[in-house]
Amino acid sequence: LHLASGRIGKPGAAPFSITGQPNAMGGREVGGLATTLAAHMDYAEENVALVRRFWAAPRMATKPGLKAVDLFRKIREGRVKALWIMATNPAVSLPDAGLVREALAQCPFVAVSDCIADTDTSRFAHVMLPAAGWGEKDGTVTNSERLISRQRALFPLAGEARPDWWIISQVAQAMGWTEAFAYDRPADIYREHARLSTYRNGGKRLFDIGHHAAISNPAYDALEPFRWGGTPFADGRFPTSDGKARLVPVAQMGQAKPLARWPMTLNTGRYRDHWHTMTRTGLSPKLSQHRREPMVEIHPADAAELEIAGDDLVQVSTPQGDSVFRALVSDGLRRGEVFTPIHWTDRQSTGGRTGLLPRPLVDPVSGQPGFKSTPARLTKLVPEWRGFVIARALPHAIPAAYATKVRVAQGWLIEVAGDGDPALLAKAMLPKGERIEVVDEARGELRVAVLEDGQLVAAMFVARSGRTPSRDWLIAQLSAAVPASSVELLAGRPAAPQADRGPIVCVCFDVGMKTIVETIDTQGLISVEAVGQALSAGTSCGTCRPAIQRLIGATQEATHA
């Protein structure tokens, strides 16, 4: 629309690259995609010749390589013999993840560079390389508006970890390309990058940072953020043969329609406080407070039709695979649609494996997989018992049909469900020590607490009904300064009544939903800012502000009903 109306390139009227990754633009700049050369050049014959000459590389690639989904298909077909994976977890994050795992399992050589030792992908690695994490890296980052910024390390390198550029250089030198990879520091690479951007450019290519081709090390260290490319298109000129823009018609691929066997449409995405496959954010108990378990969100009308209630276990199935989730009934979806989060993996859960579910269909131009419209069906599961375990130390074995673990303050919370005698589960999961327990065979309940010098070190609560105490108070007892009594521990609550804060909404300030709703109601608050002034909620990172706004709206509706 901005192009057709002649406003393209003016402030507020520019294309926005919805890439999802903070340095995706930087990846394009340096040719980090299989479909591009370095310095924002494509595989046109003249560009291949230019880069070949600049790098003195006679064996230059002359056409685009394999995109991610295609790559793993070729590995599975035996067409790719070696794979080096850096800073990603494709065994979880790609669609039809079961096929990806099959490909990794049969690939003759897999190397993985990561700052996390144990990931679903690293389990297929023949060689593991300890890489620098984000806070240990030194270099530049480019955001979506082409702003290049210096990123300086916050922490020294841990152990044998090394930056990716150093690891690549060492491998290349060992293979014989000593001169081509003789980098001593990130500034060396940046200078080469700048030289290539201006090499035989003459104004033909928008990306040109040649003014930094000879930047000194001190100047690089002190580099201030700058945006390259000026304001393209604002002058009405475009990088085409006649200088005019092109409107390219795009044929919309057909959306997946619900079928008789697959009557629902599965949408997938991320939770508010987690990122990718939780290899980093999953280490934080605070970030796990918002959602401690993988949930399938379902519209109330669909839930009623399928006789699914909140907290039920539900198997989500698609033509690609199936996985088990906890049900969350929500009117935030349209009828016929369900949503599951992408984060959970084999490392955290026996269920919640969203990567197994989407179809591996991709956009024909970008190769981007579609994760938003997979035909699916839901099946309610009825285990004999459901419950949870809390423990200071992660149990060595979790022999439950359904189990998902999450870090909490001073320990772990493991949600469990299954069939058979739960006493066998207690024996396998709980540590040795002074034990107190209550068994109610009529209700199918088992409550066990393990103490050490009177202090709680582990507990298990399971029930046929699935109704168990709130987790938060029991979790707090793992590090309580004053030990709770045996009666309180087995009851799962303190003897003296405590205010129920409800689910945590603001992680930064530990503010619960019920606290926010009560404050909105009693003080007549009508804005997120007012809630922030009263409770501090929403005044730090800001990710909970939409949730607070919804609570304000819901409270106002209830008041005027």
What does each model-identified segment do?
Residues G27-L33, D188-S284:
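Long, low-complexity segments enriched in small/aliphatic residues
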Residues P130-A132, E136, R146-A158, L283:
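Short beta-alpha connecting loops at secondary-structure transitions
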Residues G367, K372-P375, T379-A561:
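Rossmann-like nucleotide/phosphate-binding core characteristic of flavoprotein oxidoreductases
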